[in-house]
Regions:
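Short histidine-centered catalytic/ligand-binding loop motif
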Residues: 75-83, 189-190
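Active-site segment of metal-dependent pyrophosphate-handling enzymes
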Residues: 41-45, 58, 87-91, 95-154, ...
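Core subunits and conserved enzymes of cellular information-processing
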Residues: 1-10, 52-62, 87-98, 245, ...
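N-terminal strand-loop-strand
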Residues: 35-74, 87
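Short helix-coil junctions and helix-kink-helix linkers
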Residues: 202-211
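Long, intrinsically disordered, low-complexity Ser/Thr/Pro-rich regulatory/activation regions
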Residues: 230-287
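NUDIX/MutT-family hydrolases
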Residues: 6-9, 127-130, 138-181, 190-198, ...
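Acidic, metal-coordinating catalytic segment for phosphate/diphosphate chemistry
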Residues: 2-13, 24-46
Length: 287
């Protein structure tokens, strides 16, 4: 029988294999102060102020007095001052440049930039949207050479252009208005305190750019829950019987309720019965 030697005992100097290094879970240090670039990024406000007049949706525009884009039309706006909030800056710039006191519904539209929108460098703009029921006569001030209410059609259709990226901001503001009046009472923000159904219909026609059937619109508007409240008064509008006057229900703002059912705009490809697209001649013609 062969002799089997036992395995040699391990040397006292032998070390066990070192464990694999654990993956690092340490987070990079968090900066305690804003980066230097934050102090160099100007913040501006721009205002899309809309109203309805002469059967057309109009926007308040200024002609720029200074470069860049001197002499070009633009939306009212300017830079945020130290300690100023963006809504306050929007009201201040609108009043300074146009003399128009913001009346109606003002809301934040969206933020634009900062790269590529201003030839002077990166600028972040917080755009606001104003729905005005009163066509105040504007008066140029600040760095505005002139100011006017202009139909939105030429700018939306590409026949005219605004300074900076204001074509895009205007288009976004108009689309916001078109969408919101389907589901909210926002169209009443363009109306006086008391209005007829015909006046309200003309607001929808101007904002949507579409002719609506008067009877269908009257039926839908008066049956939409929480939309209108009859005042019990009437107003004569020429030939025919006087028209009933309506208002928003007391305590309800222009966006406080959701219309049930909504007043949906006709599709651009397949207009509903009694609706047709408005042409340039329609926009130029008084209501």
């Amino acid at each position: 029988m062969p002799h089997v030697r036992p395995d040699p005992a391990p040397s006292a100097s032998a070390q066990p294999p070192a464990p694999a290094p654990a993956a690092s879970t340490a987070r990079p240090p968090v900066p305690t102060a804003p980066p230097a670039t934050a102090a160099r990024l100007p913040i501006a406000v721009d205002v899309v102020a809309l109203t309805v007049a002469d059967g057309a949706l109009r926007v308040l525009l200024v002609d720029r007095l200074l470069e860049p884009y001197a002499g070009r039309p633009a939306l009212p706006g300017g830079f945020l001052l130290d300690g100023e909030d963006v809504a306050g800056a929007a009201v201040r710039e609108l009043t300074e440049e146009t003399g128009v006191a913001p009346r109606g519904h003002l809301e934040q539209l969206r933020t634009y930039g900062p790269v590529g929108r201003d030839p002077r460098g990166p600028v972040l703009s917080v755009a606001h949207l104003l729905f005005s029921p009163v066509l105040d006569l504007p008066r140029a001030g600040g760095d505005a050479a002139a100011v006017r209410w202009a139909p939105v059609g030429p700018f939306l259709e590409g026949g005219a252009h605004l300074a900076f990226d204001h074509d895009r901001i205007l288009a976004d503001g108009v689309e916001r208005a078109r969408a919101k009046i389907e589901y909210s009472p926002l169209a009443t923000a363009f109306c006086p305190e008391e209005f007829t159904i015909a006046e309200l219909r003309r607001v929808y026609e101007a904002v949507w750019g579409t002719r609506l059937d008067p009877r269908n619109f009257h039926r839908k508007a008066t049956r939409s829950e929480g939309f209108l409240q009859a005042t019990g008064r009437v107003r004569s509008e020429g030939v025919g019987r006087p028209a009933a006057l309506f208002r928003r229900p007391p305590g309800s703002g222009p966006t406080a309720a959701v219309l049930q059912p909504p007043l949906l705009r006709p599709g651009s490809d397949a207009p509903s019965s009694g609706a047709r697209r408005v042409t340039g001649a329609d926009r130029a013609a008084p209501s």
